[in-house]
Amino acid sequence: MTKGILGRKVGMTQVFTESGELIAVTAVEATPNVVLQVKNAETDGYSAIQLGYQDKRTVLSNKPEQGHASKANTAPKRYVREIRNAGDEFNVGDEIKVDTFQAGEYVDVTGITKGHGFQGAIKRLGQSRGPMTHGSRYHRRPGSMGAIINRVFKGKLLPGRMGNNKRTMQNIAIVHVDVENNLLLLKGNVPGANKSLLTVKSTVKVNAKHPEVKMANASASATNSEEA
């Protein structure tokens, strides 16, 4: 069974363990998600639940969205995502909160990376530059496309749009769960800018050798949660 919840990235902070070790964490605010639809293999071909996150004003939603949300007795949602293989214990209208997860679990976090616009090959792909002196006229250009062929080889390092891609980071440890403030404190950083949407799901690599998660000091975590 896969557990999942939608939230938004608040930012990064730091917490201390009981032994005094400092851990950098990312705060993810995950207000209660509403189950908008339950899909099963008989009717839809696969098993999944559809989650809605953050209410959307009625004037900004169309009639199909309003009708779909009314089946769950809730307002239209700004973000709607599916969590596959979530089990059969959910019904339309149920709420999923952060207490679904516990400190010490490992999760996979999916988000949209920061966009940097159109960038050159050096910044975008880490290509080495040419000589800057001694008459060289090759500094930050992409380089030769080839000698004779009338096409560009696949994989050629070229300028282009950088960032704004969907990325998933696996095996991220949950350091602390703040049920009162609807916060998950995840160890390290996660993809995306602040306030961006994140999908937190149970890790797919359940058999991986995970190091022991050092829990955060409860009092220190509460203070940092309020700051975040």
Swiss-Prot record:
Q: Which UniProt keywords apply?
A: Ribonucleoprotein, Ribosomal protein, RNA-binding, rRNA-binding
Q: Which PANTHER family match?
A: 50S RIBOSOMAL PROTEIN L3, LARGE RIBOSOMAL SUBUNIT PROTEIN UL3C
The Gene Ontology biological process annotation of the record reads: translation
NCBIfam families tied to this protein: L3_bact (TIGR03625)
- HAMAP family named among the record's database cross-references: Ribosomal_uL3_B
Alphabetical GO CC annotations of the entry are:
cytosolic large ribosomal subunit
Q: Which organism is it from?
A: Leuconostoc mesenteroides subsp. mesenteroides (strain ATCC 8293 / DSM 20343 / BCRC 11652 / CCM 1803 / JCM 6124 / NCDO 523 / NBRC 100496 / NCIMB 8023 / NCTC 12954 / NRRL B-1118 / 37Y)
> Which superkingdom heads the taxonomic lineage of this protein's source?
Bacteria
Instruction: Specify the protein name.
Output: Large ribosomal subunit protein uL3
The subunit structure is:
Part of the 50S ribosomal subunit. Forms a cluster with proteins L14 and L19.
